[in-house]
Regions:
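Class I S-adenosyl-L-methionine
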Residues: 1-11, 16-110, 118, 211
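A contiguous loop/helix-start segment that scaffolds small-molecule binding in enzyme catalytic cores
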Residues: 1-3, 75-79, 135, 144-229
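Class I SAM-dependent methyltransferase SAM-binding "motif I" and its flanking Rossmann-like core
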Residues: 10, 86-158, 201-204
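Short, solvent-exposed amphipathic alpha-helical segments in soluble enzyme
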Residues: 17-21, 43-46, 96-99, 124-125, ...
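Cofactor-binding loop segments of dinucleotide-utilizing enzymes, especially the Rossmann-like FAD-
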Residues: 33, 141, 194
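Short gly/pro/ser/thr-enriched loop/turn and capping motifs at secondary-structure boundaries
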Residues: 36-37, 55-57, 114-118, 136-137, ...
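Short hydrophobic/aromatic-enriched beta-strand-loop microsegments
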Residues: 46-53, 106-108, 127-134, 182-191
């Protein structure tokens, strides 16, 4: 059993180790938020199971995914669980390895390039900057209840870079809460859609303008929201 991060965006951002495991798998259990070219790495005889995991589209419940992993592993097959980005950055990889541990199924983990760092970077936005931003905070843009995280006030108080994942739909609420809790309306913000892909789009503004800018540009998910403490 291999828990593999596919990286963010184009297929060639996967690690060499991750690609090699896919080439030798019997079963490939994959998220929809990956480059479909990666499916071609698997043997023709491999069973390929899509479990979704994309906002606004049908996805298997996490419990069902866990059951699939255990079932296929107990059949004696080499299983690759291919997850978008990095398995442990809002990827629920921790829940999956807990299930595997409980079932006494050995596993290996292959990290992936996370969109939280790579997408801003590819847009020319460093998440840390000497003497200007000494920390970076990676925050979910929505919870299971489709609400903002409870620590949004602390996010507003930090001088570090804020990176929100899966938060495009909640952008107005994120902006409102940051301003209400003390973040300057002039704080630079960027929203990067489909980062690390050929069709990527970057929209820039400030907390006071970004919502209107994003609406005018018709930005679509997946998107990463970055608020920086420098210009």
């Amino acid at each position: 059993m291999y828990i593999v991060g596919a990286g963010c965006g184009d297929f060639d951002l996967i690690t060499m180790r991750g690609a090699e495991y896919i080439r030798h798998c019997d079963v490939l259990v994959y998220d929809s938020l990956i480059d479909v070219s990666l499916l071609g790495f698997a043997p023709e005889t491999a069973e390929k199971i899509c479990v979704g995991k994309r906002s606004g589209r049908h996805s298997e419940k996490q419990e069902n995914i866990n059951e699939i992993l255990v079932e296929k592993a107990r059949e004696g097959k080499t299983v690759v669980r291919l997850k978008g980005g990095d398995p442990f950055v809002f990827g629920r990889g921790g829940e999956e390895i807990e299930t595997l541990k409980s079932a006494d199924i050995p596993f290996d983990i292959v990290p992936g390039i996370s969109s939280s760092i790579a997408v801003p970077e590819l847009a020319g936005i460093p998440v840390t900057h000497r003497n200007l931003s000494r920390s970076v905070h990676i925050i979910t843009g929505h919870t299971a209840q489709d609400t903002l995280p409870e620590n949004i006030k602390k996010c507003a108080e930090t001088d570090g870079t804020l990176v929100f994942l899966m938060g495009l739909r909640n952008l107005p609420d994120i902006v409102e809460n940051l301003i209400r809790n003390g973040k300057s309306e002039d704080t630079p913000v960027a929203v990067v859609s489909n980062g690390a892909c050929a069709k990527n789009q970057t929209v820039r503004g400030t907390l006071s303008t970004i919502c209107e800018n994003v609406k005018s540009a018709e930005v679509v998910p997946p998107a990463v929201i970055v608020a920086v403490s420098y210009t």
